[in-house]
Amino acid sequence: MSQPSLWKDSHYFIMWASCCNWFCLDGQPEEAPPPQGARTQAYSNPGYSSFPSPTGSEPSCKACGVHFASTTRKQTCLDCKKNFCMTCSSQEGNGPRLCLLCLRFRATAFQREELMKMKVKDLRDYLSLHDISTEMCREKEELVFLVLGQQPVISEADRTRVPHLPQAFPEQQAFLTQPQTSTVPPTSPGLPSSPAQVTSVPLAQDQETQQAVGHVSQDHEEPIFPESTARVPTEDETQSVDSEDSFVPGRRASLSDLTHLEDIEGLTVRQLKEILARNFVNYKGCCEKWELMERVTRLYKDQKGLQHLVSGNEDQNGGAVPSGLEENLCKICMDSPIDCVLLECGHMVTCTKCGKRMNECPICRQYVIRAVHVFRS
């Protein structure tokens, strides 16, 4: 029996067996020596960095973004609880320190009429300072509603520092600005109450003060403030309330609800948009309420002019109306004037009420995509 022959090839031991004439492979490969110059590398964490860890964000002013070099320059607003610098915050007398934006809102005494005069950006910034989301707000009234819902509680010490009142309250303004008389004791030690100081007030101002104090009962020892006063609404406000009551709740506003131009001033933003949408007037790009009021006013005047043009059956001389005026009548109802154009064909043959019901143009039978209101020059 011949001895098996062994040789080494490709790092494997191969043995030739004389019994079966098959190659027999050894399953253990020969370990190759490491190449020269290679060295063992220690394990390293890929998430580890030799650089020092970043420090926390430095406190900065919420308004201007300047970093505070020391804690002495950092001032906290009592209303929104945010940090501001000395420039972006203010303190009136011994009162609390407030940021300029919160100070402006406190000057309005959180009255709805005054808040509606403010810009939308200021309303959003104020709500953002109080961490209130405004993503779902589409109207200015919704922002004002959120501001009124989170107005801060004003303490008794802050009530003595009432902001400047509008011109509608001259007597109250004189009462708040003048020193306290002997009938009403002062609520804080900072208010003068000595007789010598009272006698130094001019006679006219003293009479105004007595008229304002005369409405206060003797057992009521606190001064009158805007939050506790009930004022009589003016004529303009009464007209606006009456005009809003004329609209039935739950029903969309219509141009036929308006009887005079003054009724437009009493409409809300939502009602103005409903009227424009029902008459196919585009109001995109209108950011303020007065822009919507201008378009509704123009729509109202144009509608009245067209109705006056086609309403009479006789002219001024008593004769029949010329047949040429029939061209301005809607070809569907023959009652209302033509005031809309059908797209995409561009034919003007119907009024707004009939145009929104048309599926196809009555002239060319083309499919109507939409109807747009037009104004006659």
From Swiss-Prot:
One of its GO terms (molecular function) is protease binding. Residues 176-249 are annotated as: Disordered. Disruption phenotype: No visible phenotype. CDD domains: FYVE_CARP2, RING-HC_CARP2. Its main location: cytoplasm. PROSITE patterns: ZF_RING_2. GO terms for biological process: apoptotic process; intracellular protein transport; negative regulation of extrinsic apoptotic signaling pathway via death domain receptors; negative regulation of signal transduction by p53 class mediator; negative regulation of tumor necrosis factor-mediated signaling pathway; proteasome-mediated ubiquitin-dependent protein catabolic process; protein K48-linked ubiquitination; regulation of fibroblast migration. Keywords: Apoptosis, Cell membrane, Cytoplasm, Endosome, Lipoprotein, Membrane, Metal-binding, Palmitate, Phosphoprotein, Repeat, Transferase, Ubl conjugation, Ubl conjugation pathway, Zinc, Zinc-finger. A zinc finger (RING-type) spans 330-365. Ubiquitous. Detected in heart, brain, spleen, lung, liver, skeletal muscle, kidney, testis, thymus, whole embryo and embryonic stem cells. It is an enzyme of class 2 (transferase). Residues 115-134, 264-278 form the SAP domain. The modification Phosphoserine is found at residues 240, 243, 246, 254. Residues 235-245 have a biased composition (Acidic residues). Induction: Up-regulation by LPA/lysophosphatidic acid is dependent on GNA12. Pathway: Protein modification; protein ubiquitination. It catalyses: S-ubiquitinyl-[E2 ubiquitin-conjugating enzyme]-L-cysteine + [acceptor protein]-L-lysine = [E2 ubiquitin-conjugating enzyme]-L-cysteine + N(6)-ubiquitinyl-[acceptor protein]-L-lysine. Its EC number is 2.3.2.27. E3 ubiquitin-protein ligase that regulates several biological processes through the ubiquitin-mediated proteasomal degradation of various target proteins. Mediates 'Lys-48'-linked polyubiquitination of PRR5L and its subsequent proteasomal degradation thereby indirectly regulating cell migration through the mTORC2 complex. Also ubiquitinates the caspases CASP8 and CASP10, promoting their proteasomal degradation, to negatively regulate apoptosis downstream of death domain receptors. PANTHER family: CASPASE REGULATOR, RING FINGER DOMAIN-CONTAINING, E3 UBIQUITIN-PROTEIN LIGASE RIFIFYLIN. The FYVE-type zinc finger domain is required for localization to the recycling endosome membranes and the function in endocytic recycling. The RING-type zinc finger is required for the ubiquitination of target proteins. Interacts with CASP8 and CASP10. Interacts with RIPK1 (via protein kinase domain); involved in RIPK1 ubiquitination. Interacts with PRR5L. Interacts (via RING-type zinc finger) with p53/TP53; involved in p53/TP53 ubiquitination. Interacts (via RING-type zinc finger) with MDM2; the interaction stabilizes MDM2. This is E3 ubiquitin-protein ligase rififylin. It comes from Mus musculus (Mouse). The lineage of its organism: Eukaryota, Metazoa, Chordata, Craniata, Vertebrata. The gene is Rffl.
